[in-house]
Amino acid sequence: MAIAANKIAGIRAASCFDCFTAEMARRHNDANVLTLGARVTGAGLALKIIEQFLITSFDGGRHSRRVDMINAL
């Protein structure tokens, strides 16, 4: 799903499998869409990942250059 979503302008989708990857996707890549594997992620963990994704903000700074390059594609 993330691959398909990333074909849409302005979308920065990330497939996350734990809270750490969700946090880093937001902090470093300014991900704005979260995808989860239904067959490999239990309901309890999925809720924790979603919460972490929603409460985490983009760090900006040195990471902004990468996001700008992605947006320019």
Feature-to-residue mapping (PLM):
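Short glycine/serine/threonine-rich phosphate/pyrophosphate-binding segments
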Residues: 1-4
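C-terminal binding/interaction regions
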Residues: 8, 13, 19-73
